[in-house]
Curated annotation (Swiss-Prot):
Membrane topology of this protein: Single-pass type III membrane protein
Gene name for this UniProt entry: OPG107
Protein name: Protein H2
Organism: Vaccinia virus (strain Copenhagen)
The keyword DNA repair is assigned to this record: no
Keyword Transmembrane helix on entry: yes
Amino acid sequence: MDKTTLSVNACNLEYVREKAIVGVQAAKTSTLIFFVIILAISALLLWFQTSDNPVFNELTRYMRIKNTVNDWKSLTDSKTKLESDRGKLLAAGKDDIFEFKCVDFGAYFIAMRLDKKTYLPQAIRRGTGDAWMVKKAAKVDPSAQQFCQYLIKHKSNNVITCGNEMLNELGYSGYFMSPHWCSDFSNME
């Protein structure tokens, strides 16, 4: 124990530096441990990068996919704006285009309309996925038509809109896929 005796007004005071020494030693030890951990992590990362580790290959692939999807966003924005302008032209003087109708796409029916706010095609959604596609058993299928009408009557509160909303919720906009009801609707009218 390191002691220092101080005399002040005939009073002897002993100052013990033992706790200060322990604190300094703890600081030195923790600093050394910190730098050893950082050095070990750096060496591990260097080893991962110099070896053909599948973790970094997967991360590289993920970054490429993420950048590609970000590029799609600008394309989808442009296409959504074009389709919205086209929808405004289609809706001029036609108020019934904003009401759900069963649209015949050949092999299936979809209950769809133009959205009043965005003027984009909108369909009744099946759960959390894409639109209800009521498959037809024959060229003329009254039961499929009837089920489509049932969807309009009872399920019209759950909808999906082509474009950015669909891209954000499902991962695709519907415009750049063929066949898809969004791109087919654009070609129908």
